[in-house]
């Protein structure tokens, strides 16, 4: 099982576009893509009871439809309920419902900042709208800064593809790469070469 987590600095940062790029560039993994959101989209007809909806139609209308259009094997929208007496989403309950539905060889891409605290991904990519060589970054989601501590690399839109090998400098950590992409939907050769060895084989059970 390979797991990629893609988070972002804010809404509209390009998380979905990057996930579509990953799905298209790595089709042999037959990805199951899961968007985790705190917004109740109210989908009807879900094959799961509760907060998980499976998208079945590829298209451009929703993020999950875009996953399928990019080549994902399956796509889900997960809307976790808040934990009792708190406003924090109960990601543990959603994941506990999700995992048993799949074989051990299923490969997952998650779109979420918070899920990185609940899974052990092969790769965690954080998308930032403006590439910065060092912290502090501009004010962004608190969940972004928490997830950034787990990032293996930063991805940022740019006018051209460029790798900054030591571009992400976090206190107490070794410098990590920043991949600047001219189009988030199209992985640069450098990003593809960097990510493949971290995922392992794409065999399915």
Roles of regions detected by a PLM:
Residues 96-100, 104-107, 112-194, 198:
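Conserved catalytic-core segment of NTP-binding enzymes
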Residues 73-104:
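Active-site rim loops that border cofactor/substrate pockets in soluble metabolic enzymes
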Residues 19-26, 139-143:
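Histidine-anchored nucleotide/phosphate-binding helix
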Residues 3, 31-33, 74-77, 124, ...:
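Conserved beta-strand scaffold positions in the cores of enzyme catalytic domains, especially
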Residues 2-6, 31, 106-110:
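Generic beta-sheet signal
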Residues 23-85:
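N-terminal phosphate/diphosphate-binding loop that engages ATP/GTP or pyrophosphate donors
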Residues 4-22:
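Glycine-rich phosphate-binding P-loop
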């Amino acid at each position: 099982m390979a797991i990629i987590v893609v988070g972002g600095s804010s809404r509209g940062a390009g998380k979905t576009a990057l996930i579509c790029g990953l799905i298209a560039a790595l089709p042999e993994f037959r990805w199951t893509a899961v968007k985790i959101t705190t917004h109740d989209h109210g989908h009807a007809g879900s094959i799961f009871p509760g907060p998980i909806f499976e998208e079945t139609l590829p298209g451009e209308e929703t993020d999950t439809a875009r996953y399928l259009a990019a080549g994902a094997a399956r796509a889900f929208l997960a809307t976790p309920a808040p934990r009792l007496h708190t406003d924090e989403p109960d990601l543990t309950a959603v994941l506990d419902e999700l995992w048993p539905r799949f074989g051990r060889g299923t490969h997952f891409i998650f779109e979420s900042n918070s899920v990185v605290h609940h899974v052990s991904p092969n790769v965690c990519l954080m998308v930032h709208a403006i590439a910065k060589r060092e912290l502090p970054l501009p004010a962004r989601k608190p969940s972004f800064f928490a997830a950034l501590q787990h990032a293996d690399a930063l991805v940022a839109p740019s006018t051209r593809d460029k790798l900054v090998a030591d571009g992400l400098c976090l206190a107490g950590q070794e410098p990590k790469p920043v991949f600047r992409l001219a189009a988030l939907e199209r992985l640069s050769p450098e990003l593809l070469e960097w990510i493949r060895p971290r995922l392992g084989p794409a065999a399915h059970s």
